[in-house]
Amino acid sequence: MSTERKGKIGVAHIYSSFNDTIVHITDITGAETLARYSGGMFVDADRLEGSPYAALKAAMAAAKEAQRKGITHLIVKVRAPGGIKSRIPGPGATAAIRGLSRSQLTLIRVEDVTPIPHDGCRRPHGRRGRRV
């Protein structure tokens, strides 16, 4: 049984926060950008930029453009803000993955690449923390 795939492989970098979702498709090396869309390009109100609907539209537009450029398979890398910010991807992450899988592109693997600090930067709000 052969594991070789016919067609070109691309990498879909999905950055999803609670304010916006960015779908960026590159070649396998990451050097050449094939398509880049954000949720804010498809909705009018600023508060809707991070919504699942905007992420779905952005992912489908990026997938269509990548297909035009010859991509047939995708490796998906999902990223949340990370660091001292949220380690949970926003609501648009799953919708963006759904939008990519709805297109004719084959998803090879989905992985989480959120940056996790190993005792790097100190969190804000001082020694006693945030007093509410």
Swiss-Prot record:
Gene Ontology biological process terms, A to Z: translation
HAMAP family attached to this UniProt entry: Ribosomal_uS11 (MF_01310)
Keywords: Ribonucleoprotein, Ribosomal protein, RNA-binding, rRNA-binding
Disulfide bonding pattern of the chain: none
Pfam families: Ribosomal_S11
Protein name (Swiss-Prot/TrEMBL): Small ribosomal subunit protein uS11
Superkingdom of origin organism: Archaea
Entry's family note: Belongs to the universal ribosomal protein uS11 family.
Chain's gene name: rps11
GO molecular function terms noted in the UniProt entry: rRNA binding; structural constituent of ribosome
Subunit structure: Part of the 30S ribosomal subunit.
Presence of keyword rRNA-binding: yes
Entry-linked PANTHER family: 40S RIBOSOMAL PROTEIN S14/30S RIBOSOMAL PROTEIN S11
GO cellular component term of the entry, any: cytosolic small ribosomal subunit
Function: Located on the platform of the 30S subunit.
Phylogenetic lineage: Archaea, Thermoproteota, Candidatus Korarchaeia, Candidatus Korarchaeales, Candidatus Korarchaeaceae
Species: Korarchaeum cryptofilum (strain OPF8)
Ribosomal protein in keyword set: yes
